[in-house]
Amino acid sequence: MMHILVSNDDGYQAPGILALAEALSEMARVTVVAPERDRSGASNSLTLDYPLRVHGTGPHRYRVEGTPTDCVHLAITGLLSEEPDMVVSGINAGANMGDDVLYSGTVAAATEGRFLGLPAIAISLNAFEPRHLATAARVAQLIVQRLSRDPLPSDTILNINVPDLPWHEVQGWEATRLGRRHRAEPVVRDEDPRGRAIYWIGPPGSEEDAGPGTDFYAVRNGYVSVTPIQVDLTRYTALDQVAGWVSGLGRPAEEGH
């Protein structure tokens, strides 16, 4: 039977990860290794300056005093006696579309699985207070079934965003690219009880590139967005221009001391 590692960034008690683990347990052996608290926005950060503590919360269930990336790294490289066959991260409360993927701990957990050589999926539901986790859980089951039967190229991470709708209202599936947001809103300044300035990170920018073909457009129109992403961030279309730009910087070895 397939063995799936489940993680997230909302914490081990979040409704989304509980729904995901339950759904995938119907088709695979599931091990959950997740942060002990909400680590949304942790991105791909690894904890390097202090040891990680792990606490068992039930059979094949662990909470980690660390980031989502810590959880997956720890699970695959030392915690588990048997390496899983796949990593599934989610179900996140709130979409991870466009630029969101650079900050998302949900996507980061999947990315770490891909770094370590495993098929990886990140699943998010387009609502901060989800009403239809069952829809996203069913999406997870179908995607896992399909991926196990028909693997994708080894450098591919699937970023799945699901509209917060009853299953019978979902319009279908769309392969999409990442959209883009406008610049983030300003930070919010406040004061602590002693009158010292404190700051809250402001909300993300509104949708900018959100037309047909994007993840934003698909979810807005009731479709499940399936975006293949990868770790390589190189902008290949700019390489020739940058090569010419760099050539104008000179050659230090020919300039002497």
Curated annotation (Swiss-Prot):
Gene3D superfamilies according to UniProt: Survival protein SurE-like phosphatase/nucleotidase (3.40.1210.10)
Function text: Nucleotidase that shows phosphatase activity on nucleoside 5'-monophosphates.
Record family assignment: Belongs to the SurE nucleotidase family.
One Gene Ontology term of the molecular function aspect: nucleotide binding
Catalytic class of the enzyme: hydrolase
Gene of this entry: surE
Protein name: 5'-nucleotidase SurE
Cofactor (UniProt): a divalent metal cation
PANTHER family listed in its UniProt record: 5'-NUCLEOTIDASE SURE, 5'_3'-NUCLEOTIDASE SURE
TM spans (from-to): none
The organism's place on the tree of life at top rank: Bacteria
Cofactor note: Binds 1 divalent metal cation per subunit.
Keywords per UniProt: Cytoplasm, Hydrolase, Metal-binding, Nucleotide-binding
Cellular-component GO terms for this entry: cytoplasm
InterPro entries: SurE, SurE-like_Pase/nucleotidase, SurE-like_sf
Reactions mediated catalytically: a ribonucleoside 5'-phosphate + H2O = a ribonucleoside + phosphate
Residues the entry annotates as binding a divalent metal cation: 9-10, 40, 92
Subcellular compartments: Cytoplasm
EC number(s) per entry: 3.1.3.5
Pfam family name, one: SurE
